[in-house]
Amino acid sequence: MDAEAIEIWTDVNGIMTADPRVCPDALRVKTISFEEAAELAYFGAKVLHPATILPAVQKNIPVLVLNSRNPENEGTRITALATHCRSPFKSIAAKKRLTIVDLVASRMLLSHGYLHAVFEVFDNHKCAVDMVSTSEVSISLTVDSNDHLPELAAELSKLADVTYEGRKALICLVGGNIRGQNGIAAQVFHAVRHINVRMISQGASEINMSFMIDEDDVDEAVRSLHAAFFVDPDPDIFDVTARKAIESVHL
């Protein structure tokens, strides 16, 4: 595939800082990197699918996310390298219908090959794992909720004591500017201090920060985070014209 650009036509003005149905003041992201877009696609951004941008990443072809209902809008441009942004995050995504699986095995966790045996069970059931947290005697994992969890748990019970709890959701904040910045995690969890957080993760890429909460708390968490991190958006990265128009009406 050789092309100058790939156009993806959707029903929104490109990638947004959050789901506009949850945050009416969500902003259009003007430009974002392939790496950042791939993270958002995996963690639930509705306008992208991971397989959609993979060929473009491999060929270094820019991707344009445009609105078929508003073709004059510039949309979002996805490029190989991220443009510098003074804001730590570009967007907030949420992935619902997840289940936390907890395994406790005080004797076996330290034995050689234990984690391999656990993940082999998930592989046998073709069950992808989103997040993993381990301690001396336990493992917590998150998976998509499905009807086969009882069978999965039954097989895992041969390795450990197993419990699982559904109706969870993953909140993911994505931005290349969080690398090496002090205090970002403190700001994130201060913004959601009124919400119970079950698991926390920062990816090896260091461009995303994720945590698990109850599904019922998703909208409140996204709105709180958006209010905390997009109060003074970088106009080079975000389309602030709509927000300025609303503010001028209220003056």
Provide a role label for each language-model segment.
Residues M1-L251:
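C-terminal catalytic "cap/lid" subdomain
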